[in-house]
Amino acid sequence: PLPSSSASFPTNVTFVAQDWMDGTVAAQYDLILCLSLTKWIHLHHGDEGLVRFFGRIVQSLRPGGIVAMEIQPWQSYSQARSLSRSLRVSHARLRIRPDDMEWILCLLGMTSLGPIAQGAGFGFVRSVCVFQAPPTQVERIPACFGWPWVERRPNKLAPPTPR
């Protein structure tokens, strides 16, 4: 977050590296940068953890704030699962796919601004997608956004059918 008495760029920029999956995030940020990590959060914390991570992003951005996110392709998940037995087990349980992530972020109130870059070096050829937070503060994500709040249907996520 920018301090209220900040000077001009570059002294008004603060970087914070932290594990959002452990503990709470109380600060409000103008920009959240997520590079090469959605796959690892998804594999280690499952579908529920990924949705919780996205909810924390929405709650942690100032109104109108930006998240720039590199969403790894499903193929890279298959490569990662070979690293350990626990990742293979986790991989087999995942229902959310990378192609679903934009839809989930938009459902949580974010606006997709589209891709801004396509990496071409060192084996990374992934786009960085940009999302903008709603113009008003999100106080809390409604309970209906806890997992499971969607059912996987043929190549889509859809709200559960009322019973």
Give the location of each predicted region.
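S-adenosyl-L-methionine
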Residues: 1-23
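A short acidic, Gly/Pro-enriched loop at the edge of an enzyme's catalytic core
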Residues: 22-32
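A short SAM/SAH-binding and catalytic strip from SAM-dependent methyltransferases
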Residues: 30-47
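A short glycine-rich, Lys/Arg-flanked "PGG" loop and its adjoining helix->strand segment in the class I
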Residues: 49-63
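Conserved Class I S-adenosyl-L-methionine
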Residues: 80-116, 121-123, 142
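Core SAM-dependent methyltransferase catalytic element
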Residues: 114-160
